[in-house]
Curated annotation (Swiss-Prot):
Belongs to the peptidase C47 family. GO terms for molecular function: cysteine-type peptidase activity. SUPFAM superfamilies: Cystatin/monellin, Cysteine proteinases. One of its GO terms (cellular component) is extracellular region. GO terms for biological process: proteolysis; symbiont-mediated suppression of host chemokine signal transduction pathway. Residues 1-25 form the signal peptide. It comes from Staphylococcus aureus (strain NCTC 8325 / PS 47). Its EC number is 3.4.22.48. In the cytoplasm, prematurely activated/folded ScpA forms a stable non-covalent complex with ScpB. This is Staphopain A.
Length: 388
């Protein structure tokens, strides 16, 4: 719908992995340094609040298992690597703590993101929020035995290698703000060498844990036919992507596409006016009605039980979010899709969400209405449209 002010974040990484599988933390400690090297992330300091570390260690396996079951993966064993931070170009942390989730081959499968609660907007009573998604996990695994830097701007995330060439590795559909400079300089090595400490993100911090018990005990409920068929590019069609994937799921078809949805609703728009147009809730409801559905607007976040019942009855839910950081720009408002819900083995209730920007799903605390997304922003879930 609406777009966001671009931000720049710098993250420097050094990659070197052995092909030897990791059995557990103890066996890893016996591997000599010359035989085993790890992905290292440059950070200003390695300090992590005790509450943050405890939350990650206590809950990561439950959240990861919920996504494994959504993806129909087999039971597996995981552990956490050392946490790292992401910095803006002024070398200030973005405020989040990132914990890589390692499989027994030493690769990163997921990223646990722990964020301070945004008091003004969040309905959660906890001090921190935890979310799990694939995020940059695949990217981190692609640069073994290389020293790289990861940067982000309005177009997405870049890897800068030792030859100073930048490659776009993860797109985020964001536009340059007209008030900003047309060109953005990539920081030289001096900008990141001031980050003196290194977090070995692929070094296990504890023994690997099997999710066998967790897997068996968890309750998972998903729109049976929900698939990610396309992702949002440089446009304002988040509502189009959301509705097309929900309708594809509930009708068990592949016929809906975001561009066709937007063209149906805005047949007379051309060029950039069409490319960057968004949809109102009324237009979203109208489109659902034209497709044989009876969508209803709910002026709040759906509860866990509502998601559970609607999903069981094959009724899709669209999330309507308002960006916390800024109410201006192309993505000041954003639509996402509810994939399903899960009750973790510890009793925690979560909602599984798909952001049209992403190639994977993410977990969301069912009692927290502020959703962190893959470009570092947060969206307050203020309304829902259900019944697709």
């Amino acid at each position: 719908m609406k777009r966001n002010f671009p931000k720049l974040i710098a993250l420097s990484l050094i990659f070197s992995l052995s092909v030897t599988p990791i059995a557990n933390a103890e066996s890893n400690s016996n591997i000599k340094a010359k035989d085993k090297k790890h992905v290292q992330v440059n950070v200003e300091d390695k300090s992590v609040p005790t509450d943050v570390r405890n939350l990650a260690q206590k809950d990561y396996l439950s959240y990861v298992t919920s996504l494994d079951k959504i993806y129909n993966k087999e039971k597996a064993s995981y552990t956490l690597g050392e946490p790292f931070k992401i910095y803006k170009f002024n070398k200030k942390s973005d405020g989040n703590y990132y914990f890589p989730v390692l499989n027994t081959e030493g690769n990163i499968d997921y990223i646990v993101t722990i964020s301070p609660k945004i008091t003004k907007y969040s309905s959660s009573s906890s001090k921190y929020t935890i979310n799990v998604s694939p995020f940059l996990s695949k990217v981190l695994n692609q640069y073994k035995d290389q020293q790289i830097t990861i940067l982000t701007n309005s177009k997405g995330y870049y890897v800068v290698t030792q030859n100073h060439k930048a490659k776009l590795v993860l797109k985020t559909p964001r536009l340059e703000d007209k008030k900003l400079k047309k060109t953005e300089s990539i920081p030289t090595g001096n900008n990141v060498t001031q980050l003196k400490q290194k977090a070995s993100v692929t070094m296990p911090t504890s023994q690997f844990k099997s999710n066998n018990y967790t897997y068996n005990e968890q309750y998972i409920n998903k729109l049976e036919n929900f698939k990610i068929r396309e992702t949002q590019g440089n446009n304002g069609w988040c509502a189009g992507y959301t509705m097309s994937e929900l309708l594809n799921a509930t009708y068990n078809t592949n016929k809906y596409h975001a561009e066709a949805v937007m063209r149906f609703l805005h047949p007379n728009l051309q060029g950039q006016r069409f490319q960057f147009t968004g949809l109102t809730p009324r237009e979203m409801i109208y489109f659902g009605q034209t497709q044989g559905r009876s969508p209803q607007l709910l002026n709040r976040m759906t509860t866990y039980n509502e998601v559970d019942n609607l999903t069981k009855n094959n009724k899709g839910i669209a999330v309507l979010g308002s960006r916390v950081e800024s109410r201006n720009g192309m993505h000041a408002g954003h639509a996402m899709a509810v994939v399903g819900n899960a009750k973790l083995d510890n009793g925690q209730e979560v909602i599984i969400i798909w952001n049209p920007w992403d190639n994977g799903f993410m977990t969301q605390d069912a009692k927290n209405n502020v959703i962190p997304v893959s470009n570092g922003d947060h969206y307050r879930w203020y309304s829902s449209i259900y019944g697709y």
